[in-house]
Amino acid sequence: MREVISINVGQAGCQIANSCWELYCLEHGIQPDGYLTEERKAQDPDQGFSTFFSETGNGKHVPRAIYCDLEPNVVDEVRTGAYRNLFHPEMMITGKEDASNNYARGHYTVGKELIDGVLDKIRRVADNCAGLQGFLVFHSFGGGTGSGFGALLMERLSVDYGKKSKLEFCVYPAPQTATSVVEPYNSILTTHTTLEHSDCSFMVDNEAIYDICRRNLGLERPNYENLNRLIAQVVSSITASLRFDGSLNVDLNEFQTNLVPYPRIHFPLVAYSPVISAAKAAHEANSVQEMTMSCFEPNNQMVKCDPRHGKYMATCLLYRGDVVPNDAHAAVATLKTKRTIQFVDWCPTGFKLGICYQAPENVPNGDLAKVSRAVCMLSNTTAIAEAWSSLSLKFDLMHSKRAFVHWYVGEGMEEGEFSEAREDLAALERDYEEVATDSMGDEELEAEY
């Protein structure tokens, strides 16, 4: 079986993971203590558990997950929470002092002490897998542990597991709302370090998800749990075809093959539909056509950028539940007639479909309604460069005055690393611009010779 190991780094990574595992357990019929519910026992025994769970001799299902944070508070909540008996206690690794929003502490000083222990635990989980497919790494770009320790971990995973897929789910700093002043520094430093080590990075930004929760779920003041449960639905959709049957299955390597035209351009934009509250669910038709169209509206996308200003290179549509291939193909045919959805000229077809027959689950008493079908769209678009440019601007404003730089240098970082990281990001923005420019000219020139 193709197993996937989840590694959750820092506060954001660990809290998103809590929502994800809560959802996986509901989907697979696993109780908070790790044992199957009675009705699930009566069904087909092999229900695709083994991708995310390993089964012990006495029938307990243990997540293939590792929690690591440089300070204990967030992981302690898992250790004492409703799912404390689900996770292996040794797979929760915490330090004594946090990274204080400082990339250099997470990557160099404090992180260095913890990394070998974490890799040792990863090795133990990996040895338990028959055919390890890859890693999902959850972390934020703005925090100290998420950015610094996350980057260190990606570097070390590349050394130890070079051939395995490494997919990241990153919480990207929102354009308007910031949790710390030095987010632009941390984000650009971690992007620079992980650019060559990550195969595919799915970015979500808090502001975009706040807006989706406010608009679609009618929550005036969404909290992190509301946001994380929405992100969990996306992660579940992306991994559903690894766990359940479907007519068009997609595995981790296929994501890269279909979404990443060049190694550096690996930041797909994520959208999910329908996000709908229980109160409104009964009044909506929620047809395949409607769902598919709504994924292309900027309002439903999980990073603040406008895809109408960019061009698409590739798009994956992952359907779940009561969807027949015919409807999906019809929806895509309609999309292709739309003038607003522009593809780069060197990739005219650009749509990859996945269908998984397992209907989406919802958390009891949660905000999301129970729906019979859903779609998650992953699209590689040049518009995501907008997100980078707004971040670069903030970085430049601070770095021109060398503000806060001494905190990083004091933790053993070279000051030159800032300029190096900034140049790398400028190169990434240029890469996106080049991809968007029409490439027909070169071919015509070649044809003349």
Curated annotation (Swiss-Prot):
Q: Where is this site: Involved in polymerization?
A: Y449
Which of this chain's residues are annotated to bind Mg(2+)?
A: E71
Reactions listed under catalytic activity: GTP + H2O = GDP + phosphate + H(+)
Specify which residues bind GTP according to the UniProt entry for this protein.
Q11, E71, S140, G144, T145, T179, N206, N228
Listed GO MF terms: GTP binding; hydrolase activity; metal ion binding; structural constituent of cytoskeleton
Which cofactors does it use?
Answer: Mg(2+)
Gene Ontology annotations of biological process type: microtubule-based process
Q: Where in the cell is it found?
A: Cytoplasm, Cytoskeleton
Secretion signal span: none
Enzyme Commission (EC) number: 3.6.5.-
Question: According to its UniProt record, which residues of this chain constitute the active site?
Answer: E254
Q: Which UniProt keywords apply?
A: Cytoplasm, Cytoskeleton, GTP-binding, Hydrolase, Magnesium, Metal-binding, Microtubule, Nucleotide-binding
Q: What is its main location?
A: cytoplasm
Q: Which domain of life is it from?
A: Eukaryota
Q: Name one GO cellular component term.
A: microtubule
Q: List the disulfide bonds.
A: none
Query: What protein family is recorded?
Result: Belongs to the tubulin family.
What's this chain's function? Tubulin is the major constituent of microtubules, a cylinder consisting of laterally associated linear protofilaments composed of alpha- and beta-tubulin heterodimers. Microtubules grow by the addition of GTP-tubulin dimers to the microtubule end, where a stabilizing cap forms. Below the cap, tubulin dimers are in GDP-bound state, owing to GTPase activity of alpha-tubulin.
Assembly and partners? Answer: Dimer of alpha and beta chains. A typical microtubule is a hollow water-filled tube with an outer diameter of 25 nm and an inner diameter of 15 nM. Alpha-beta heterodimers associate head-to-tail to form protofilaments running lengthwise along the microtubule wall with the beta-tubulin subunit facing the microtubule plus end conferring a structural polarity. Microtubules usually have 13 protofilaments but different protofilament numbers can be found in some organisms and specialized cells.
> What name does this protein carry?
Tubulin alpha chain
